[in-house]
A protein has these predicted regions:
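Helical "substrate-binding/catalytic lid" subdomain
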Residues: 1-79, 85
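C-terminal active-site/capping subdomain that shapes the small-molecule cofactor and substrate pocket
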Residues: 55-127
């Protein structure tokens, strides 16, 4: 039951937290909260609608799906001064690359700052 409820957190409160991280990053780019929500809200709604119609794998897009490691590296550099937002970005990106179709996976993992998440998980389980 606890795992079910923990999983459900990703569908609502943590989705709101993810959008809040996006709003914070947008504010650093000079975009106010109202405008940021006007940009991110429809994007999030369209993504949820796509997932409902097509499933996770077919709805996954952007530089992680394309294997655009240079763009991912630029994102990380832009977020360096905001460690908590950068941590959220890295963690979600690592999970996405591990669980969803991604071109150029090794280069994306390197751009995210390390080797395979699967390998790091295995190492931590040994200790």
């Amino acid at each position: 039951k606890a795992m079910y409820h923990a999983a459900a957190m990703f569908g609502s409160p943590l989705m709101v937290a993810t959008l809040a991280a996006g709003v914070r990053a947008m504010s650093e780019a000079g975009i106010g909260e109202k405008e940021a929500l006007a940009l991110l809200g429809p994007m999030a709604a369209a993504t949820v609608a796509n997932v409902e119609k097509q499933g996770l794998a077919r709805s996954f897009s952007g530089p992680l799906a394309r294997g655009d490691a240079a763009t991912v590296k630029l994102h990380r550099e832009a977020l360096e001064e905001h460690p908590l937002v950068a941590h959220v970005y890295n963690s979600l990106a690592q999970l996405a690359v591990r669980d969803l179709p991604s071109a150029n996976r090794a280069a994306i993992e390197a751009a995210l700052g390390g080797g395979s998440l699967d390998n790091r998980s295995r190492r931590s389980k040994r200790h």
